[in-house]
């Protein structure tokens, strides 16, 4: 299951994580976000480091990373943003980007 990322654990779970971390910025009311959810959860089940940030609850993080549209998926590595995708993405595409940064 993807980790729920908050302002309290963002530093530890994302910025200080070993290896790449896929972060899904989403909201409960967002239809495309609900479509993206299963692919993100499947990657987490397969052992990839995946977190989800609810932009309504954690607006500070979304603002810090200039997330203007959702879903936005950002891959971080070594505390830095390495890849950003806006809109629904396939599991295969996300997995290939995570593998490339491993």
Predicted features and spans:
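A short beta-strand-turn-helix
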Residues: 3-21, 59
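Conserved Rossmann-like nucleotide-binding pocket used by diverse enzymes
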Residues: 6, 26, 51
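Short pre-active-site segment immediately N-terminal to redox-active cysteine/selenocysteine motifs
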Residues: 18-21, 25-29, 69
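Hydrophobic beta-strand anchors of alpha/beta hydrolase catalytic cores
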Residues: 22-23, 50, 73
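Typically the conserved alpha-helix immediately C-terminal to a functionally engaged Cys/Sec
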Residues: 32-46
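Conserved acidic residues
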Residues: 54-56
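Structural micro-motif
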Residues: 59, 65-74
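Non-catalytic, surface beta->alpha helical segment in thiol-disulfide oxidoreductase systems
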Residues: 77-102
């Amino acid at each position: 299951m993807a980790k729920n990322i908050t302002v309290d654990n963002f530093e530890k779970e994302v910025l200080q994580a070993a290896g790449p971390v896929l972060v899904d910025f989403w909201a409960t009311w967002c239809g495309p976000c609900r479509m993206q959810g299963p692919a993100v959860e499947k990657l987490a089940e397969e052992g990839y480091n995946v977190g989800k940030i609810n932009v309504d609850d954690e607006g500070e993080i979304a603002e810090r990373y200039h997330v203007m549209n959702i879903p936005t998926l950002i891959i971080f590595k070594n505390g830095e943003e390495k890849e950003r995708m806006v809109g629904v993405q396939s599991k295969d595409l996300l997995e290939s980007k995570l593998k490339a940064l491993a």
